Structures are given as structure tokens and as C-alpha cells.
Amino acid sequence: MVVQDAETAADCALELQRSFSELPLADLGLPQTLGLRLGGHFGPVFPLYDPVLNQMAFMGSHVSRTARIEPVTPEGTVYVTDAFAAALAVPRQPRFICNYMGVVPAAKDYGSMRMFALSRRSSTRSE
């Protein structure tokens, strides 16, 4: 998914994670251990028409980088890159917390990236 800003992407990722966690997995015939992994990166992408799928798509190195995050993210978590975390830190009243998780090897031998676990900032928390 491509959105215009990091805050919208963070809201979307955390809402997807919350919604998934509330699914009645057993009622749906799914294993209780099933979890969702989400990854995010912030950078320019290039729209282009995909003639195979007959629709618009996005391409570029930042799309490839993002695709290498999800496979190494623990289930039930949203991992984001340092570029994404930095974009979220810009507002005067940041709504999100990005906890540094270390340098994590990316999927498919893409190298290593500094990863952050994304969460919402509690409205009662004073910092």
C-alpha cells in the first residue's frame, strides 16, 4: 500500500494489526497461532502502468526495501525503517512511538536495516 505521508501509513498499519488481532480465528477455521506481520518504509516511489495486471502499480528501490521488512517482522508487530521513524518524529506532538529493535538482516539477502517497532503513543503518557 502506498500513501502520501508516514502518519497515515502508521495509522493504517496499526489499525490493520488491531483489527486482525480481534478476528475470531477459531470460528473462521484458522489456527489460533496465526499472526499478522507488517512492515513500513518511507521514501519516493514511481507510479507506472502494469500491462500484465492492467492497473497502476508502484516501482522503485524503496518498494523493494519495504518488501524485505515483513518477512523478518515478528507476528503481531509492525516494524518500520529509520526513514519511517524519522518522518514520524517530525511533528511537534508525535502520535507514535518507534522503539529501536536493532540492526536486523532483511529478507532475501537484501542486507541489514535499522528496525523500529511501531506503536501508538498513549494519550495519558507524559513525555
What label would you give each PLM region?
Residues R125-E127:
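Short, charged, solvent-exposed linker or helix-capping segments at domain edges/interfaces
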Residues V2-S123:
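Catalytic beta-strand-to-alpha-helix segment of the class III nucleotidyl cyclase homology domain
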